[in-house]
Each structure stands twice: as C-alpha cells, then as structure tokens.
Amino acid sequence: MIFTLVNGCVNYSNRFFGEVLADPSLASPILFPETVFNAPSSHISALIGSAAPNDTLIADGTGFFSGLDLAAEWIERGDVDGCLVVSAEEIDWLSAEGLGYYSKCYLPAEGAAAVYLESADVGVRLLRLPDPVSFSARSRVEATVKLRAKLDAKDDGQTLLVDGRCGIARIDRPETEAWHDWKGARWSPRKLIGEAMGASVALQAVAALESVRAGEFQRAVVTATGGNQQAADMLIGSI
C-alpha cells in the first residue's frame, strides 16, 4: 500500500499534544508514533492484515500521481501483485489559514479516495503516466504546457478531461492555458468540493475512473498543477 498526503494527521496530532500539555504524565513514547506521517498507512495495513510493502509519500497536491507511479514500479518488479494507493486529508484551522496565504478565495475541504492498481486484462486501464514536470527550471505554466504535450491525449469527443482548477483565475492559469483549446467534456471537481490538498487529485482520479467504468467515456485525462513541486497527469481508458 502507498499513502500520499500533504498535511498528515493534524487533528490527531493536535489532540495528542493538547492532552500532553494538559497532563505531562500522558507523554508516553508508545503513543507518539500515532502522530507521524506514516501512521495512517500503517494502520490500514494492519486493519487489512497486509504484510506487503508499505510506504508514505509526502508531496504537494500532485503526490497521488507519484503514488501511482511507485505502485506501477512495484508491480512491474514483481514486488507485489497489486497495490492500493490512498490519499486522505483532514482540515483544521491552521491548514485553512495556510491556504489563505495563497488566496482568500480558497474553499478548504477534506476527504479520502483510493485506487487499486494491478496487472490485469480487465477493468479500467492506466494507459499513460508520463514523468511529472518539475518547477525547478520552468514556470508553472510552462511545466503544465510541456506536460500536456508529453501526454498527447486526443480530443476526440470520447475523452473526458478532469482538471485541477479550483475557480481562482490566478491559481488556475497553468491548466487554463495548457488546455485552452480542449473542446471535449471537462470536469473541475475542486470548484464544487473545494481544495482538499493531497486528496484532491485522488478524488479527481476516482471521478474519472467511475466515468470510464460506467461507459460515459472511453478515456479520461486527470491533470493537476501542484503548489510548489511539479505538474503531473495521466490517461486512463477502457481501450
């Protein structure tokens, strides 16, 4: 299993440290691991009885793509038969305030979503997952434009575009410009459910997967431009 996130267990950590400050006798080292980034992944593996590889990736909002890429690598190497890629975020006042530094118009959100990736001949297929494009040597707009060219998705009326736009023009500019000529169906889930940070791309991916699985579209593009690291996307489809 691979768990991807931005914030981590903020509410649990706040509760833990609040109790410790109120009563230092509660400061047991046995409890401390519950507050670290890898705690959710470890708990889920224990819940499902998995002794397989388990990892947590901390990234910007595009981390779910990195999780899928690592899962595909594990499967190709024969380390695992299948991999559950999960992302979850919970919101508190501190993370909501942090979003406000980017824009006062952000709508903070939370949630969780997961995709199970395996080598099989049935189900929705991961057709393309190009390497992400870093912001280290180019702007966010340039990175997103280059990424679209690498994906080379066909605007044929049978392909859905599920983008990462949130309804704030300045934040949305990279994807707005990179996909300005897209004439097919286009969904922007964050405009409806808000900014769930690490979980947003996972929610986009599930929306895209369900649209293909239900036969609404033959293929779907999922794309996102991260806050400070990279732009990433993928193409999935039934054929």
Residue spans for each PLM region:
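Internal active-site segments that recognize and position negatively charged phosphoryl groups
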Residues: 70
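Conserved "HGTGT" condensation-loop signature of ketosynthase/thiolase-family condensing enzymes
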Residues: 2-59, 65, 73-80, 88-239
